[in-house]
Amino acid sequence: AGRPFLLFLSLVFGLLSISGTGSCTTVVLGWSRDGLSAARIGVLTTGSGVAMLVGAAGATRLSRRVRGGVLLLAATAVTVSATAGLALVPSVPGRALLLVLLFCAAPIMNAVGGGYVMRLIPTGMFGRVGGALLLINLGLPAAAPWLAGRGLDAVGRSGTLWGFTALGSLALGLMLASRRLRTLGLPSQWDAADEAP
């Protein structure tokens, strides 16, 4: 049951990565289309970079104090809510703040999810299985910029953002359906989590 669950996790996190990366790309491309200067876009996205550093710095401390399942689902819910907000909020400052929220929660989600995946890979198969999972996790998000551009041309900014929100919502739903993820404990307890999703 180990390999199917690893594939399940890879799919879920791949969908979340497409959702977040695609939403951010859609917003930036939309700003460029609206005529915002490159300098202003750079300033607006600087907050996202700072937020990612803050989220990464807090991820380790939080993972030691909060159960993995709670932290993972909460961070994922925040990222999905932020992508939905990007579709609902039309203002430039509002979208910039939502990107900050998204990029603050994403490192927490990645830290718990990535750490758990690494724990599940058998030592003797780390190279082969890890390489396959890395291919999936890098390959799926690589499509996000293309999807964002095509979406903007086909259905506009709002429609594209709702599409990426739907992907994130699907991933969140899959996570909620997995008892193994919902009940995931602290990192010290991960070895005991052996039930299939």
Residues of each region from the PLM?
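Pair of pore-lining "gating" transmembrane helices in MFS-fold secondary transporters
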Residues: G2-T21, V100
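C-terminal transmembrane bundle of multi-pass solute transporters/carriers
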Residues: L9, V27, W31-P197
